[in-house]
Amino acid sequence: MNPQLIEAIIGCLLHDIGKPVQRAALGYPGRHSAIGRAFMKKVWLRDSRNPSQFTDEVDEADIGVSDRRILDAISYHHSSALRTAAENGRLAADAPAYIAYNIAAGTDRRKADSDDGHGASTWDPDTPLYSMFNRFGSGTANLAFAPEMLDDRKPINIPSPRRIEFDKDRYAAIVNKLKAILVDLERSDTYLASLLNVLEATLSFVPSSTDASEVVDVSLFDHLKLTGALGACIWHYLQATGQSDFKSALFDKQDTFYNEKAFLLTTFDVSGIQDFIYTIHSSGAAKMLRARSFYLEMLTEHLIDELLARVGLSRANLNYSGGGHAYLLLPNTESARKSVEQFEREANDWLLENFATRLFIATGSVPLAANDLMRRPNESASQASNRALRYSGLYRELSEQLSAKKLARYSADQLRELNSRDHDGQKGDRECSVCHTVNRTVSADDEPKCSLCQALTAASSQIQSESRRFLLISDGATKGLPLPFGATLTFCSRADADKALQQPQTRRRYAKNKFFAGECLGTGLWVGDYVAQMEFGDYVKRASGIARLGVLRLDVDNLGQAFTHGFMEQGNGKFNTISRTAAFSRMLSLFFRQHINYVLARPKLRPITGDDPARPREATIIYSGGDDVFVVGAWDDVIEFGIELRERFHEFTQGKLTVSAGIGMFPDKYPISVMAREVGDLEDAAKSLPGKNGVALFDREFTFGWDELLSKVIEEKYRHIADYFSGNEERGMAFIYKLLELLAERDDRITKARWVYFLTRMRNPTGDTAPFQQFANRLHQWFQDPTDAKQLKTALHLYIYRTRKEESE
């Protein structure tokens, strides 16, 4: 990446660095822009003065021009400072930070130019960050996050009605973390990636603005990240249009620039992911499934970084990734548009060569102007509504482009190449025993494997390795997982990753599932990779009662609609901004990629088993992307996990988003592709409920809303049965099988009489009949109501599965 571009991005990312320093009350004088400049001089440039000795000086003779460009981005991102600087001839002609800031600020706030400026109505420096879900959907709430940093050892930060002040001590701890990376500031792609990681870890719950008269729900990290993305796009756009005097183009003529289509909202989507993951049939399916899922996640991340690198951007320009899908903000230049086209063509050539038509990538792009993103001063309600509709329409247009490409996937050259192959589009004569391809098979043993499945088998044990949390993307490696554009993925230790950075063939490195705050370690990735046992058969042995696997498929209901219209319902759409949709996407990804591991490792709910809540779940995450989850494990743990994940998600989103799921039970030798299909059918049944927000358990017949399953089926009816038969399970089993037989014939008129007769016969004449009478009365009450009868039938099945000792088919 161009060094001056890197400087521009760093300047944009750090333009508000003075805010946490100011709120920490460390003794620096002046407004946050002056404090930020002084702080950077002390930490980065090793200025020996005490904080109180700094003044608002900008003409430092001992600081080089290159360093001053970064410092000036911090000093001159507000209009009043810009105007004074321009009048005094101090403003750099090639600094885009000020216009990028204005656009970013215009997307998420803002009545005041600065939260320590004269326009601020109520400056509340101790305010916490409020949840974006307060303004999502209908119904306004006032929940706030706890003032803390991201920590992979802690549960996700759930917003609460209790306000916890963000005091100066908490800010001081954040500033100390920031110092660790700012002290070694360098102009490199790797440093940019690490800086973004540290800013996310430290500033995700720090409010960008503390003006209490505005909605304080955009984090400082999301504001800085968006400013960095906009600044990079502007730099490229003005370079491409031959405008070297940025001051003239962006400051003197800023209203003209706001209407220029300088940006390109771009998306891509990888099709065929589910079939690729589940189309296997071999021993060791658990390891292979996880390896294939992880491989596709890394394929998506590699595609993202490759496209960004070709355009000349950092991950600040990534708005969302998950489930093989991504949104990026690019400059609207001929070079960027051609890069997207070439990227799509080369990626599909590689996918065709390696996977035939199983995987396909489609891209889409729409140009937009700053005014498509910004709230303008004195914007009327109708203007806000029209702007919000234009913004959501961009995503609809992108979706239409993707759909059109999926209907006409390949170019003429690609079709000719496909037609030159065998009838199934593949080459070769031996079939891989795992994925059934015939175009890469190289082994000749009893279970022949293609080269990819051999590599995945070798990688499967490394995916969960604590000592190999680092991933390298390299050129020309002979071992590892193949990726498009001549790259290879390998796993390594921290020490090996450090050495690899010095090698020219290393493109980039990733750190998996760890907040390495303050360390320059490359791109941080969150992956749902929890695993308790390496083989499915081990889960069957650990299940209580019947020896069965539980399989869960779950996803967010109406996520596409939520993404494009979720912030449209309040304030005439004025909250439907790119800063909020980007933060919304990031927090969902964090929930399903990071927090899901925590929920499995440290459960709280045991409504069926009643086991020790602290016992980690017996389960494996096969896949957990942007909003889609596939988990296999002991059947009882899987059901309880599904309930708990939904509970945590409900708390996190304030009930504004819902999930639906299918949960099936299978023998451990059942083909995984069939499991996936059958549980997918159950998930569809859950989504067919009015309002969705449900779960289908074992069979489409047993489809319930989540609250109904937990409160009515499990806590009421299952618990009633289990408590009564506690200590006398053998007598209970025969009784329950007869109840199920009668419930199955409930619509027959004679069955009601048979039901009463059977309950009467079951009374123990020699014992205390009062408990039985109470038990039977509840059963009879439930039998008469069709909804209660369905819930009772499900509860009886759960009790049988929980107490059955011998497996029978």
From Swiss-Prot:
Signal sequence range: none
Statement: the UniProt record of this protein carries the keyword RNA-binding: yes
GO MF term set: ATP binding; endonuclease activity; exonuclease activity; RNA binding; transferase activity
GO cellular component term, pick one: plasma membrane
Pfam families: Cas10-Cmr2_palm2 (PF22335), Cmr2_hel_dom2 (PF20824), Csm1_B (PF18211)
InterPro entries assigned to the protein according to its UniProt record, in alphabetical order: Cas10-Cmr2_palm2, Cas10/Csm1, Cas10/Csm1_subtype-III-A, Cmr2-like_C, Csm1_B, GGDEF_dom, HD_domain, Rev_trsase/Diguanyl_cyclase
Disruption phenotype: Deletion of the entire CRISPR-Cas locus (cas6 to cas2, Rv2824c to Rv2816c) decreases resistance to plasmids encoding spacer elements about 6-fold.
Residue span, HD domain: 1-98
Cofactors that this protein relies on: a divalent metal cation
Keyword Transferase listed: yes
Limits of the GGDEF domain: 547-700
Biological process terms in GO annotation: defense response to virus
EC number of the protein: 3.1.-.-, 2.7.7.-
Keywords for this protein: Antiviral defense, ATP-binding, Endonuclease, Exonuclease, Hydrolase, Nuclease, Nucleotide-binding, RNA-binding, Transferase
Note: Encoded in a type III-A CRISPR locus.
Purpose of the protein: CRISPR (clustered regularly interspaced short palindromic repeat) is an adaptive immune system that provides protection against mobile genetic elements (viruses, transposable elements and conjugative plasmids). CRISPR clusters contain spacers, sequences complementary to antecedent mobile elements, and target invading nucleic acids. CRISPR clusters are transcribed and processed into CRISPR RNA (crRNA). This subunit is a single-strand-specific deoxyribonuclease (ssDNase) which digests both linear and circular ssDNA; it has both exo- and endonuclease activity.
Domain notes: The N-terminal HD domain has ssDNase activity. The C-terminal GGDEF domain has the cOA synthesis activity.
Record text on subunit structure and interactions: Part of the Csm effector complex, that includes Cas10, Csm2, Csm3, Csm4, Csm5 and mature crRNA.
UniProt similarity note: Belongs to the CRISPR-associated Cas10/Csm1 family.
Protein's name according to its UniProt entry: CRISPR system single-strand-specific deoxyribonuclease Cas10/Csm1 (subtype III-A)
